[in-house]
Amino acid sequence: MRSILIFVFAALSIKIHAQVVRIPDPKFKQRVIALGYDKNDDNQIQVSEAQAVTSLYLNDLDIVNMEGINGFTNLEELGVYNNKLTALDVSKLKKLKFLYAFNNRIKDLNITGLTKLEHLFVQDNIFITALDVSKLTVLKELNFTGNRLTKLDLTGLTVLEKIDGQDNNLETISLRQAPQVKRVNLKNNLFKVTIDIRGLTNLEYLDVSGAQLLFLNFSGTVHLKEYYW
């Protein structure tokens, strides 16, 4: 019986190591191979090979499909900027801390459950109209410049320090949900009347110019050094 169990365990181990990550986009696949992650030189990426990667940059390749990226489950840093992506699902990359996905054509972005994400760059995608960052509780830096967001919920982002959201269609935002924020660039949005920045004691830089604000209440912004409105 013991020998049978050992055989079964060994067979399962071999199967796991032999499983191949399906990567339909040839440019995506070839870059991963060119970076040296195909350790057994079979022109495929095994699950075990993908799981050994912690940092991956696939920028400037005209990639259109990122299917297979969720097989790289130990990634902490991912760069897919300057491609032709229309969708990006990285929801299985639970260890991800840095995501650089700017200058694509992304419309559908799934970053659900990335509770370790600290830096998110999705600027210049044009088609992003909604962005759910409410569960990204350790996020420190957020850049969504040059998209089409009309609203953004910052609930729970208690360590967020930097927001870049210039050239969107934001009509409202509650910056007080991000009490540690230091730098805010929300130039050229559609804000009206005012934005509540009261009590943001760490705020040092604020740009909300290009909107139709009537007034700002600077109460409590004791470290504010530079502002434009």
Which functions belong to the PLM regions below?
Residues 54-58, 78-80, 97-101, 118-122, ...:
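Conserved hydrophobic beta-strand positions in leucine-rich repeat
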Residues 14-79, 94, 115, 137, ...:
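N-terminal capping/linker segments that flank leucine-rich repeat
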Residues 69, 77-85, 91-105, 113, ...:
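Right-handed parallel beta-helix
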Residues 64-69, 88, 109, 130-131, ...:
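Canonical leucine-rich repeat
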